[in-house]
Amino acid sequence: MKNSIKVERAIHSLTQEQLAQKLGVSRQTIHTIEANKYVPSTVLALKLAQLFNKQVGEIFRLDEED
């Protein structure tokens, strides 16, 4: 699964730490999601979409391998 969190974060001028604080997670969680090493829970994916005013499918997309 690929995501555009890093791009959205840059658009909103947020650091990983700032985004993590807004979502109530660690900076490491944001880092691993951005690196496509961790797939977030449904709740966290929805929170990200809401924060960035996007649909979940606009932020997360399936890879051919998925």
Per-segment meaning from a language model:
Residues 3-22:
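Short basic helix-loop element that most often maps to the first helix and adjoining turn
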Residues 43-58:
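DNA major-groove recognition helix of helix-turn-helix/homeodomain DNA-binding modules
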Residues 60-66:
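Short, charged recognition helix plus adjacent turn
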Residues 25-38:
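Recognition helix of helix-turn-helix/homeodomain-like DNA-binding domains
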Residues 18, 29, 58:
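Residues in the helix-turn-helix
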